[in-house]
UniProtKB/Swiss-Prot annotation:
Entry keyword Cell wall biogenesis/degradation: no
Keyword Transmembrane helix: yes
Name of this protein: Alpha-N-acetylgalactosaminide alpha-2,6-sialyltransferase 1
Any single biological process term in GO: protein glycosylation
Protein encoded by which gene: ST6GALNAC1
Pathway: Protein modification; protein glycosylation
Assigned protein family: Belongs to the glycosyltransferase 29 family.
Reaction(s) catalysed by this chain's protein: a beta-D-galactosyl-(1->3)-N-acetyl-alpha-D-galactosaminyl derivative + CMP-N-acetyl-beta-neuraminate = a beta-D-galactosyl-(1->3)-[N-acetyl-alpha-neuraminyl-(2->6)]-N-acetyl-alpha-D-galactosaminyl derivative + CMP + H(+); a 3-O-[N-acetyl-alpha-D-galactosaminyl]-L-seryl-[protein] + CMP-N-acetyl-beta-neuraminate = a 3-O-[N-acetyl-alpha-neuraminosyl-(2->6)-N-acetyl-alpha-D-galactosaminyl]-L-seryl-[protein] + CMP + H(+); a 3-O-[N-acetyl-alpha-D-galactosaminyl]-L-threonyl-[protein] + CMP-N-acetyl-beta-neuraminate = a 3-O-[N-acetyl-alpha-neuraminosyl-(2->6)-N-acetyl-alpha-D-galactosaminyl]-L-threonyl-[protein] + CMP + H(+); a 3-O-[beta-D-galactosyl-(1->3)-N-acetyl-alpha-D-galactosaminyl]-L-seryl-[protein] + CMP-N-acetyl-beta-neuraminate = a 3-O-{beta-D-galactosyl-(1->3)-[N-acetyl-alpha-neuraminosyl-(2->6)]-N-acetyl-alpha-D-galactosaminyl}-L-seryl-[protein] + CMP + H(+)
Primary location recorded for the protein, binned into one broad class: Golgi
EC number: 2.4.3.3
Domain of life: Eukaryota
Length: 566
């Protein structure tokens, strides 16, 4: 090498260095080939790869689910990522920020935007009958945005495609802003509902179905279905205290009636509604009523219930000629007062000797496990109305048969009042109306056919179903427990006995209550038919203290008579 350099002319330095670099490169290449090092040394020089191949290599390890079988980017994956980003932006927005923050979306990065323009749309394998097509992502996305809405944050309702804030009880200090009035004329379509429901959204085209995300799915023109789990406390609406009133029933002529006394009471004057609709039937049910009552959880409405089930049950309930059926049945024009005894199952009745006094009333109301045999001297024998929920009826027959309650009260003149507290009540009532076995999983272990619980002369004209409006009115105005402001608000409802007593106060002129909780209840067993003393346990699903206070006040204001022991 030195010899060659010395023989070169001095003015050829450029040529000399080029020769040195060439020889040096040749030597390095030769040694690399011998030891297999050419890949690592020249790997950085491979820069002429296609954009599609780079996306495949760079991304496939991180998001393999976003790719189709042939290695090209799947439109489904891109749309899922965008929906996921938009959803997380909405969820992470602090509640104190304005509505503009809730509408914020994330724009995809430039590399994804470039790739989306030339993607091949490949549907999921389970989507049958859809041919693979190549389409512009931008146009598909635009069509999709018109048909889809992002899943809202809990506490946010969807109405006509616009997001509105659902009021929660904790926001009462700003009541005007905290309540929402929906449009009842709007048909309801339930998101992610697999049940056979009434209103169905228009079927989207196959291309839209194919690209709909699986996990972070947007709903196609569907109003968000209200769920109790989305509310930390009982939701409040600006129509929460509005009810259907009845103007067709006769007016009481009794000057000492509950209505007359309530009108003179400073406490009840603005609370008591003497003409509220008590019972529901097919004439009270339509799409508008479904939309309204779907905002309230059972027994106060239809939240989370299936429209088809509710509609089938309601359509089979015969119309009630009169809501005030006792006043309508009064045959005399002479001013008389209708007296009613409402018999609870409290231990205070044990050895009370109230049986004869109870039977002296015009009508006697009994509830759930109304054991009579062996306790006639304490609770009487007469029954005019029997109130229950599906569960309280079947469980009482199951658990109290050995104590004498082997069948529900039956007779020619007995009427039944059903308080529909949950979906199982609608399933049970449907089976009763159709005279069929109840569906498996809905109280069927207590007996398959509900009609077997009634006598052979049973007709639906003897069967009354409490209107959800009426039950919500009782809860809102008389038994609004503080438990409704707690996370377990959905568990609370007034006791079945409380619902029956308040129903009697809206049907009768004079009411006497027996076997209800009073001061000093600790001295008595839970039930009058208990063979051994059992303490009354206060569970969160009922508010016995509140009921005790209400009964005491009604008694003190001479609205009703409450049986108490000194």
């Amino acid at each position: 090498m030195g010899f060659l350099i010395r023989r070169l002319p001095k003015d050829s330095r450029i040529f000399r260095w080029l020769l040195i670099l060439t020889v040096f490169s040749f030597i390095i290449t030769s040694f690399s080939a011998l030891f297999g090092m050419e890949k690592s040394i020249f790997r950085q020089l491979k820069i002429y790869q296609s954009i599609a191949h780079m996306l495949q290599v760079d991304t496939q390890d991180q998001q393999g689910s976003n790719y189709s079988a042939n290695g090209r980017i799947s439109k489904v994956g891109l749309e899922r990522d965008i929906a996921w980003l938009e959803l997380n932006t909405a969820v992470s927005t602090p509640s104190g920020e304005g509505k503009e923050e809730q509408k914020k979306t994330v724009k995809p990065v430039a590399k994804v935007e470039e790739a989306k323009e030339k993607v091949t749309v490949k549907p999921f394998p389970e989507v049958m009958g859809i041919t693979n097509t190549t389409a512009s992502t931008a146009s598909v996305v635009e069509r999709t945005k018109e048909k889809t809405t992002a899943r809202p944050v809990p506490g946010v309702g969807e109405a006509d495609g616009k997001r509105t804030t659902i009021a929660l009880p904790s926001m009462k200090e700003d009541k005007e802003k905290a309540t929402v009035k929906p449009s009842f004329g709007m048909k309801v379509a339930h998101a992610n509902s697999t049940s056979k429901d009434k209103p169905k959204a228009e079927e989207p085209p196959a291309s839209v179905k194919a690209i709909r995300p699986v996990t972070q799915a947007a709903t196609v023109t569907e109003k968000k279905k209200l769920r109790a789990a989305d509310f930390k406390t009982e939701p409040q609406w600006d129509f929460d205290d509005e009810y259907i009133l009845d103007s067709s029933s006769p007016v009481s002529t009794c000057s000492e009636s509950v209505r007359a006394k309530a009108a003179k009471s400073d406490w009840l004057r603005d609370l008591f509604l003497p003409n509220i609709t008590l019972f529901i039937d097919k004439s009270y049910f339509n799409v508008s009523e479904w939309d309204r009552l779907e905002h309230f959880a059972p027994p106060y409405g239809f939240m989370e219930l299936n429209y088809s089930l509710v509609e089938e049950v309601m359509s089979r309930l015969p119309p009630n000629p009169h809501q005030q059926l006792l006043l309508a049945n009064s045959s005399s024009n002479v001013s008389t007062c209708i007296s009613c005894a409402v018999v609870g199952n409290g231990g205070i009745l044990n050895n009370s000797g109230m049986g004869q006094e109870i039977d002296s009333h015009d009508y006697v109301f009994r509830v759930s496990g109304a054991v009579i045999k062996g306790y006639e001297k304490d609770v009487g024998t007469k029954t005019s109305f029997y109130g229950f929920t599906a569960y309280s009826l079947v469980s009482s027959l199951q658990n109290l048969g050995h104590k004498g309650f082997k069948k529900i009260p039956q007779g020619k003149h007995i009427r039944y009042i059903h308080f529909l507290e949950a979906v199982r009540d609608y399933e049970w009532l449907k089976a009763l109306l159709l005279d069929k076995d109840i569906r498996k999983g809905f109280l069927n272990y207590y007996g398959r056919r509900p009609r077997e619980r009634f006598d052979e002369d049973f007709t639906m004209n003897k069967y009354l179903v409490a209107h959800p409006d009426f039950l919500r009115y009782l809860k809102n105005r008389f038994l609004k427990s503080k438990n409704l402001q707690k996370p377990y608000w959905r568990l609370y409802r007034p006791t079945t006995g409380a619902l029956l007593l308040l129903t009697a106060l809206h049907l009768c002129d004079r009411v006497s209550a027996y076997g209800y909780i009073t001061e000093g209840h600790q001295k008595y067993s839970d039930h009058y038919y208990d063979k051994e003393w059992k303490r009354l346990v206060f569970y969160v699903n009922h508010d016995f203290n509140l009921e005790k206070q209400v009964w005491k006040r009604l008694h003190d204001e001479n609205i009703m008579k409450l049986y108490q022991r000194s």
